[in-house]
Amino acid sequence: MPEQFAVPRSVEWEETSVKILNQQKLPEKTEYLHLTTKEDIYDAIQTLKVRGAPAIGITAAFGLALCAQSIDTSDVSAFLRELRKIKDELNQARPTAVNLSWALNRLLKSAEGAKSVNEAKTNLVHEAIQIQVEDEETCRQIGQNALHLFKSGDSIMTICNAGSIATSRYGTALSPFYLAKTKDLDLHIYACETRPVLQGARLTAWELMQGGIDVTLITDSMAAHTMKEKNISAVIVGADRIARNGDTANKIGTFGLAILAKAFQIPFFIAAPLSTFDVSISCGDDIPIEERDPDEVRRINGTQIAPQEVPVFNPAFDITPHDLISGIITEKGIITDRFEEEIEALFSAEALT
């Protein structure tokens, strides 16, 4: 990790708690929370105190491992029954990001082969830590695979926050910018503010400035004008779930950016780990879209900006069809054509390793 990488970790394991960076308080305040109960973990995920698909998965994994330590039985079958109940409850915290269920299922599997409750509890902690370790290397590799897509002097647009604080380290869509800095590649990022929760303004702008990365903030409605006037060379975003055909769920506004990128003949890239793919679903129509509190739209930082009685449609995500995507950057390489065939081949190869 380069010395100038000053972005704090979003999630850390402690023996008696899960320590998270409270992303709801950024950028005004750097606050850490110590989560000690199932309810704490659920609330942190649901209320966006921790967010970003990989970070959600890591937090849930740590949370399940932590809650397991309090299951008071020496019977393995009884332990696993209680563990499954906790897993199912945590899995309801947010419906769109597939990393949540992926991490919880992986942890459950690590416990199911144990011969004793103590062994199961130990396995859960080790597996959760391993998920975090793997995610950091995965994100670094995603950035490495993306680097050749950009050249020094390029201006690149992003939305939401697919950065270091959305993962264990580096990020997905923002990973190449951290790596570019270590290689003296001059890249400039235009970050869309990302209404209504302002992850681009509050989080991406903050973390890139923490990391010494050249960033300019724009409102979402400025994207088309910025593409034209600032010679944007590419758009890169993260993902919360990717279907078998390459259709991608990501933060609301992503679909619009993809349409604009096509209009300006700008490449549009998704950056995501294999854990974000859901090969059990055929297309984006099968991805559940979370709808959030209407007051997220009616208010900004607690200040009323719209009539309290006005009806609000507030989907947290949208679906970008695969035919608008130039490439999906993963830790195993870049998928650029025949998405369904390449995704199927990639997961078939993974199953053999």
Swiss-Prot record:
Which gene is the coding source of this polypeptide chain?
mtnA
Q: Which domain of life is it from?
A: Bacteria
Which family is it part of?
Belongs to the eIF-2B alpha/beta/delta subunits family. MtnA subfamily.
| Residues forming coiled coils | none
Q: What class of enzyme is it?
A: isomerase
InterPro entries linked: IF-2B-related, IF-M1Pi, IF_2B-like_C, Initiation_fac_2B_a/b/d, M1Pi_N, NagB/RpiA_transferase-like
Record-annotated active site? D240 (proton donor)
Q: What is its EC number?
A: 5.3.1.23
The protein's GO terms of the molecular function aspect are: S-methyl-5-thioribose-1-phosphate isomerase activity
**UniProt organism field:** Bacillus licheniformis (strain ATCC 14580 / DSM 13 / JCM 2505 / CCUG 7422 / NBRC 12200 / NCIMB 9375 / NCTC 10341 / NRRL NRS-1264 / Gibson 46)
Alphabetized NCBIfam families for the sequence: eIF-2B_rel, PRK05720.1, salvage_mtnA
What Gene3D superfamilies does this protein map onto? translation initiation factor eif-2b, domain 1 (1.20.120.420), Translation initiation factor eif-2b, domain 2 (3.40.50.10470)
Q: Sum up the protein's function in the record's words.
A: Catalyzes the interconversion of methylthioribose-1-phosphate (MTR-1-P) into methylthioribulose-1-phosphate (MTRu-1-P).
Write out the entry's keywords from A to Z.
Amino-acid biosynthesis, Isomerase, Methionine biosynthesis
- Which residues participate in substrate binding? R51, G52, A53, R94, Q199, N250, K251
**Per the UniProt entry, what is one GO biological process?**
L-methionine salvage from methylthioadenosine
Q: What is this protein called?
A: Methylthioribose-1-phosphate isomerase
The record, for SUPFAM superfamilies, names: NagB/RpiA/CoA transferase-like (SSF100950)
